[in-house]
From Swiss-Prot:
Function: This is one of the proteins that binds to the 5S RNA in the ribosome where it forms part of the central protuberance.
SUPFAM superfamilies per record: Ribosomal protein L25-like
PANTHER family: RIBOSOMAL PROTEIN L25/GLN-TRNA SYNTHETASE, ANTI-CODON-BINDING DOMAIN-CONTAINING PROTEIN, RIBOSOMAL PROTEIN L25_GLN-TRNA SYNTHETASE, ANTI-CODON-BINDING DOMAIN-CONTAINING PROTEIN
Family designation: Belongs to the bacterial ribosomal protein bL25 family. CTC subfamily.
Gene Ontology biological process terms, A to Z: translation
GO cellular component, one term: cytosolic large ribosomal subunit
The protein's name in its UniProt record: Large ribosomal subunit protein bL25
InterPro entries: Rbsml_bL25/Gln-tRNA_synth_N (IPR020056), Ribosomal_bL25/Gln-tRNA_synth (IPR011035), Ribosomal_bL25_b-dom (IPR020057), Ribosomal_bL25_C (IPR037121), Ribosomal_bL25_long (IPR001021), Ribosomal_L25_dom (IPR029751), Ribosomal_uL5_bac-type (IPR020930)
CDD domains xref list: Ribosomal_L25_TL5_CTC
GO MF, any single term: structural constituent of ribosome
Binding partners and assembly: Part of the 50S ribosomal subunit; part of the 5S rRNA/L5/L18/L25 subcomplex. Contacts the 5S rRNA. Binds to the 5S rRNA independently of L5 and L18.
Record's keyword terms, sorted: Ribonucleoprotein, Ribosomal protein, RNA-binding, rRNA-binding
Lineage per the UniProt record: Bacteria, Pseudomonadati, Pseudomonadota, Gammaproteobacteria, Pseudomonadales
Length: 203
């Protein structure tokens, strides 16, 4: 059984007012499924099922089996609209996955060996925490690993330095953009203490 599944029903009552009623009265999340040379499909899902699925971070970059009224189709999450204060999902966009056709998806970055630069006196800043990739469905990675173990204070990592998994292409690089991924800098508190020491000496 696929670990990543969602049950849904088609909905014909559309519009912002209808979506609000779904969320308020029936604890449902409105959503749209599109792509794959088929017409967009408006659906609704139980909010508790959506929340349970998203407890697994891998769901954000994994192919999901969506069961709409008994008809199964493979999709990926394209976008989620969340409540600004409470954080729960208010609306979802899914894109159909077609075997043999490349897809574009957002994949999280997993940073490895972060303790090494910290032990050398550095602080790590994550400039980018997810990457847009394009690949065939069978090659879709759940995450991209970035090893920070060899970094020294003052070092940084750019997208061009990462090795993409087999069959995977980084969209930003394809468009000529070399994203900054992470950097190691000296702790700001050291600078502040030095300035305070200078001020004390001046007095």
């Amino acid at each position: 059984m696929n670990e990543f599944t969602l049950n849904a029903e088609q909905r014909s009552d559309l519009g912002k007012g209808a979506s609000r009623r779904l969320r308020r009265l029936a604890s449902l999340v409105p959503a749209v499924v599109y792509g794959g040379d088929k017409a967009p499909e408006s659906i609704s899902m139980l909010a508790k099922e959506v929340a349970k699925l998203l407890e697994n971070d891998a769901a954000y970059s994994h192919i999901i089996e969506l069961n709409v009224g008994g008809q199964k189709q493979n999709v990926i999450i394209k976008a989620l609209q969340r409540h600004p204060a409470k954080g729960h999902v208010m609306h979802a966009d899914f894109v159909r996955v077609i075997a043999g056709q490349k897809l574009t998806a957002i994949v999280p970055i997993h940073f490895l060996n972060e303790e090494a630069p910290v032990k050398k006196g550095g602080e790590i800043s994550h400039t980018t925490t997810e990457l847009e990739v394009t690949c065939l469905p069978k090659d879709l990675p759940e995450f991209i690993e970035v090893d920070l173990g060899a970094l020294e204070v003052g070092d940084n990592v750019h997208l061009s330095e990462l090795k993409a998994p087999k069959g995977v292409e980084f969209v930003a690089l394809a468009h000529g953009t070399d994203l900054a991924i992470a950097n190691v800098h000296a702790p700001r508190i050291v600078k502040d203490e030095a300035e305070e020491g200078e001020e004390g000496a001046a007095e």
